[in-house]
Curated annotation (Swiss-Prot):
The keyword RNA-binding applies. Probable RNase involved in rRNA stability through maturation and/or degradation of precursor rRNAs. Binds to RNA in loop regions with AU-rich sequences. The lineage of its organism: Archaea, Methanobacteriati, Methanobacteriota, Stenosarchaea group, Halobacteria. One of its GO terms (molecular function) is mRNA 3'-UTR AU-rich region binding. Transmembrane segments: none annotated. Belongs to the FAU-1 family. Keywords: Endonuclease, Hydrolase, Nuclease, RNA-binding, rRNA processing. The gene is fau-1. Residues 93-139 form the S1 motif domain. This is Probable ribonuclease FAU-1. It is an enzyme of class 3 (hydrolase). InterPro entries: DUF402, FomD-like_sf, Ntdp-like, RNA-bd_FAU-1. It comes from the Archaea. It holds the Pfam family DUF402. GO terms for biological process: rRNA processing.
Length: 471
């Protein structure tokens, strides 16, 4: 049975979903334990960790073993069609032989081989490093594919757990974040774990509340993982060529779309009061997340996602600058720049964004010159599977309209987000209308990046939009 620990704004919904799928949820936070009073969610070492990404858009999953990774992935991938799941080529806990490509303020950029990079803070390595140095590192914090950040590396090799972790090359047997270190030190001596030589115990906060038996089981599990990693490292000669040495864990990233957040609302609603748009609002900002908790605690009731109230309170408002974050099915995210919100309709859940374009090249698929002074006027409607952008010259002449087909649009306080589905509808200045890039969508299906169901939806939307704008 796969044991999973879950943290973040999606924890309640995912706990319900995972348990319904037959997986065990362990080391749950106090609020989660309170919402599942009849479930055994106590302290235990998980096979997989699910954590909300820093931007709240999805979750990162790190699993110890392929079977456990597949079990968790199957549950997450079964969410609605605008969920995307990608493997990470630089997973948490992986060990690399690396070369310093160059240094920047506060750290070094590492070449890990095979077009992989990581950031090494100077404080995460004992020795001074400079361009061209080679060293062995472990990945401490992997990075979602839609982020610009590189994964963060450290010179300390760690076997991470929920109750405790083991650090290689640490002199002290017991250290940690937990406050009662003296009691944990006594417990460790009593348990007398068979920790590999040159590895030290680091107790996590969850370890302080665990029973002695749970602590002992956790240390035995971690020691076995450390033994396997130590054997792999012993067989790997450190060399000057960057490359992967060991990947004991698998890291996956899941991007949640609007349909998925609504489905997670439904799962959460089976165990706790959940307003419409609960996860959608919480994904916007810390302040918005706190407001949802407050409203639900008061028993506030609304019939649908309150677009007007949310944008009134948290933005975007007319005159605000907002970024267009254009996700891709392979996990990349492209910024289409920032624009000014020129109109907002609470009734229609819509904003209008205007951007001034720079000169150079042509507009994709329209085949007309992109000139300085051109404007792009885009209408984003919350929940729509497409949005239109009208391009005009400096004197107001229409150059064409690009109707982008995408996963349901989400208008967050600082950005509009969606995943582009490649197929689009083009309306030329002379009124001619065509669907473009069908082949790119089919290539994504063939590569396993887009499901057949999602591709059929995208083509259906494109055909419907084509018919509407051709009239």
């Amino acid at each position: 049975m796969t044991r999973v620990r879950v943290r973040g704004i999606y924890a309640t919904a995912l706990t319900q979903l995972l348990r319904n799928a037959g997986l065990d949820v362990v080391a749950a936070s106090p609020p989660i334990r309170a919402r599942f009073p009849d479930a055994d969610l106590g302290a235990a070492e998980p096979h997989a960790d699910i954590r909300m990404t820093p931007d709240r858009q999805g979750v990162g999953i790190t699993a110890h073993g392929d079977d456990h990774a597949r079990a968790v992935r199957a549950v997450v991938a079964d969410l609605p069609r605008d969920t995307f799941v990608w493997p990470d080529p630089v997973p948490r806990g992986a060990v690399f032989d690396a070369a310093v490509d160059h240094t920047v303020g506060g750290g070094a950029i590492l070449d890990l081989g095979d077009d992989r990079e990581a950031y090494l803070p100077f404080g995460a390595v004992d020795d001074h490093v400079t361009d061209g140095d080679t060293l062995r590192v472990a990945i401490r914090d992997p990075a979602p594919p839609w982020h610009d950040d590189r994964p963060t590396a450290t010179s300390t090799i760690t076997v991470s757990g929920a109750l405790a972790s083991l650090d290689r090359g640490v002199d002290a047997l017991v250290a940690g974040a937990a406050t009662d270190r003296a009691e944990l030190a006594r417990a460790t001596e009593l348990l007398d774990p068979d920790i590999p030589d040159n590895w030290g115990v680091y107790w996590e906060y969850d370890g302080a509340d665990a029973s002695l038996d749970a602590r002992g089981t956790a240390l035995d599990t971690l020691a076995a993982r450390a033994d396997r990693l130590e054997a792999t490292l012993a067989d790997a000669d450190g060399g000057d060529t960057p490359g992967l040495v060991a990947a004991p864990d698998t890291t996956l990233w899941a991007w949640f779309g609007r349909e998925t957040r609504c489905a997670l609302d439904d799962h959460r609603r089976t165990v706790a009061a959940t307003m419409p748009g609960h996860h959608r609002i919480k994904a916007g900002s810390d302040a918005a997340s706190d407001a949802v908790d407050f409203a639900e605690a008061l028993g506030a009731s609304v019939d649908e996602f309150p677009f007007g109230a949310v944008t009134d309170q948290f933005g975007p408002s007319v005159g605000a600058s907002i970024e267009i974050q254009h996700g891709k099915p392979d996990g990349a995210l492209i910024s289409l720049g920032r624009g000014e919100v020129t109109d907002r309709s609470a009734e229609n859940a819509r904003i209008t964004v205007e951007r001034e374009m720079t000169g150079g090249g042509t507009y994709d698929a329209l085949g007309v010159a992109r000139e300085a002074g051109d404007t792009a006027t885009t209408r984003f409607t919350e929940g729509n599977w497409w949005y239109p952008t009208v391009y005009r010259s400096e004197d107001g002449e229409r150059k064409g309209t690009y109707l982008n087909v995408c996963t349901p649009v989400e208008v967050f306080p600082d950005a509009v987000r969606y995943v582009d589905l490649h197929v689009d509808v083009i309306k030329h200045a002379d009124g001619a209308v065509e669907i473009v890039d069908r082949e790119e969508l089919q290539d994504c299906v063939a590569d396993g990046l887009v499901s057949e169901e999602l591709a059929e939806k995208a083509l259906s939307v494109a055909e419907r939009v084509q018919s509407a704008v051709a009239e």
